[in-house]
């Protein structure tokens, strides 16, 4: 692995150390989400076989998608990437247009695409956007949009939830 990439990853992790493992999160539901879905460290049954030949970031993001699919158990997932991980997390999942779990890169995303997603989501929907560190302005727009609810900034990706019964919050998480 490239030494510069590893050093940058270590620097990002150190800058976010105060946001580790749910520290500072007062909501029990959000704390549970950070501890037992986002930052779960116990090895899952599929970890040995999944992503054996992937680079460290693809494997890290794939394992997050695996845990999200395992937690949500969606019937349909919309994603171009991480399909093996998502399928392993929920075997009954099929891929197509979905409002349950959407995984998409933010770099090539338009406002029209986001509006389309916002108009079809339910309170149980989860949107995972990758590459938020490259397009911070667009990520801030997603966080600030009144149609989104709880958001988690993981530096490499963002997780958006749409349950409007809960107070709108943005959490920075050391992932």
Task: Name each region found by the language model.
Residues 1-125, 132-175:
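A short alpha-helical cap/connector motif
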